[in-house]
Design a protein with these regions (language model features):
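Bacterial Sec-dependent N-terminal signal peptides
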Residues: 1-30
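Low-complexity, acidic/polar, glycine-enriched regions of mature
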Residues: 26-195
Length: 195
């Protein structure tokens, strides 16, 4: 009887271990393009402008236990520079030139650490993070606050980031022989779904 009880305990321990490993592996996820949006918002001496990312990719590895976000093991995200589209050919050409798109194909973010996780409501979290942002071959460590929603097998990351283009050796684009000048700072507004 004792031997049977010990065997049952070993079996239960093995089952719990196996199921927790399976749960963690099941959390690897990729960007769902159809459910994601990233817009770059900028200014000029004439009018405000915006550019939308039409191609994005990336992977995330959140740790979710019982539907609760316990941490983010890894997160990366990339935007294809040549798929940044404003709908204005001249502006798009100037943007690609400024970002040196022939040499640097992607803008890339990679999570370095999560400093603080706050539960804001059921299945919603605020993450204070640091990550490496690479634009036009220049990498800078940035602070980024993510609002994260856990929705079944999906994790949805949203937020805004202010970027000074000159810190990445980018000359703000000009148009009409310099008559239209864009501001050096842009806001990146994003909502990216991983599944």
């Amino acid at each position: 009887m004792k031997k049977l009880k010990i065997n049952q305990n070993i079996f239960l321990a093995f089952l719990l271990l196996f199921s927790s490993i399976y749960t963690l592996k099941a959390q690897d996820s990729k960007v769902v393009l159809s459910e994601s949006k990233l817009t770059v918002l900028g200014t000029s001496n004439v009018h405000d402008w915006e550019i939308e990312a039409k191609a994005m990719s990336g992977k995330s590895h959140p740790t979710i236990v019982g539907g609760v976000l316990k941490g983010i093991k890894s997160l990366d995200f990339a935007v294809e520079v040549e798929q940044l589209v404003s709908g204005r050919k001249g502006m798009d050409a100037n943007t690609l030139k400024a970002l040196k798109s022939k040499t640097y194909k992607n803008i890339h973010f990679k999570l370095v650490n999560v400093a603080k996780t706050t539960i804001t409501s059921t299945n919603n979290y605020s993450l204070e993070t640091q990550g490496d942002l690479t634009v036009s071959g220049v990498t800078k460590r940035i602070n980024q606050i993510f609002l994260v929603k856990v929705q079944g097998s999906k994790t949805i990351f949203s937020g805004k980031t202010k970027i000074d283009m000159t810190q990445y050796n980018i000359k703000p684009p000009k148009a009409l022989m310099g008559a239209i000048k864009t501001g050096a700072a842009v806001i990146v507004d994003f909502k990216v779904t991983y599944n």
